[in-house]
A protein has these predicted regions:
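Hydrophobic, helix-forming membrane-interacting segments
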Residues: 2-71
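N-terminal topogenic membrane-targeting module
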Residues: 41-153, 162
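C-terminal structured domain segments
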Residues: 263, 267-300
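Structural motif
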Residues: 80-85, 145-150, 209-214, 273-277, ...
């Protein structure tokens, strides 16, 4: 019953069907008001009226259900599952979108205790090959994304997919007890805006810090030395602040616009530090072009490392091996 209740809560189908059913009850009354000759109300018994309305309602409901499921079959579900020490739970899905899913489980790819430049490169190539192959075979024009893994992989994954296709994102809600997949709401109820600050030091390296899950102050950048910094953060931070489709898309638009307003000609290196949700990282990768935007070095963060940003992937490097920026050969404490 719990799964049925969740489906009814999440799906628009039953609401539309119920509304149509209620309206059809009033068909005889509408016919009488409009003086339609189709219904001879004096000759029709109550039983006949109920039968006509019931049959008509069932036909409409069945047609809508068929259309609903045929429409959903245009979706391809992108499931990213993989980060050391974490794995998405094996949920039995209640949502009909899953009838069209193509899961890409990356959990086995990304687990590597050594984390050398070679192992990161091999993991990236395997992910790239997996998603590229399935994407080329895929005839879907709509995609649904959910999951999490290392930030650089999420960003590069977003760049693999065309921006002219429709994407929908689920959010992985994590509590002390469980991790579950939830649909984003259409609109957010609370006010939470992005604010930005540009710190100019006339340096050749620019760091762009995006913080919605943690505050910017907690993102230590001392290992990079003196740099120019663009900070983009939300008034309220936390894992659940991006709780709606509108907020996800609006914030993505704002972040991309603020990044593109920068005079990139001044900088020889641009570093992206993203402390935000997996779906936001994926969309930023999709929105920031490999052709027209500059080369971004997207860093992985590890709170247990001696240096919190131990490695990165570069977005525009043609050679995949050159994409991997591995900073500390002797640092195995992460």
């Amino acid at each position: 019953m719990g799964k049925i209740a969740k489906y009814l809560k999440e799906s628009w189908y039953w609401i539309v069907t119920l509304v149509i059913g209620i309206l059809m009850i009033f068909i005889p009354n509408i016919a009488q008001i409009l003086n339609w000759s189709v219904f001879n109300l004096e000759k029709l018994s109550e039983y006949h009226l109920i039968t006509i309305v019931g049959v008509a309602f069932c036909i409409v409901a069945i047609l809508m259900l068929v259309f609903h499921f045929l429409h959903l079959r245009n979706y391809c579900i992108i499931k990213v599952d993989g980060m050391k020490g974490k794995k998405l739970p094996n949920q039995k899905s209640y949502y009909p979108l899953d009838i069209a899913k193509q899961e890409f489980d990356c959990y086995s790819i990304f687990i590597d205790d050594e984390k050398s430049k070679q192992s990161i490169y091999e993991a990236y190539c395997e992910m790239k090959g997996m998603f590229k192959t399935n994407n080329e075979k895929c005839l879907y024009d709509k995609y649904l994304f959910y999951g999490y893994t290392y930030t650089p992989f999420l960003f590069m994954l977003g760049q693999m997919y065309s921006d002219n296709r429709k994407y929908y994102c689920f959010h992985m809600q994590q509590t002390n007890q469980s991790t579950k997949r939830v649909r984003l709401k259409r609109k957010s109820k609370d006010d939470n805006n992005l604010i930005d600050a540009y710190h100019e030091n006339n340096k050749e390296t620019l760091i762009i810090r995006v913080g919605t899950t943690v505050t910017i102050n907690n993102m230590n950048i001392s290992q990079f030395g003196e740099t120019d910094v663009l900070d983009i953060t939300s008034n309220k931070t936390g894992t659940e602040v991006i709780d709606s489709i509108d907020r996800l898309n609006d914030w993505c638009d704002i972040i991309v616009k603020k990044i593109r307003n920068i005079d990139f000609a001044r900088y020889s290196k641009i570093i992206l530090l993203l402390a935000t949700s997996a779906e936001m990282v994926f969309l930023l990768g999709k929105r920031l072009s490999k052709n027209s935007d500059p080369n971004f070095y997207v860093y992985h963060y590890d709170v247990n490392a001696k240096n919190p940003y131990p490695w990165a992937l570069a977005s525009k490097m043609v050679n995949d091996y050159d994409k991997v920026v591995y900073l500390y050969k002797n640092d195995r404490n992460y």
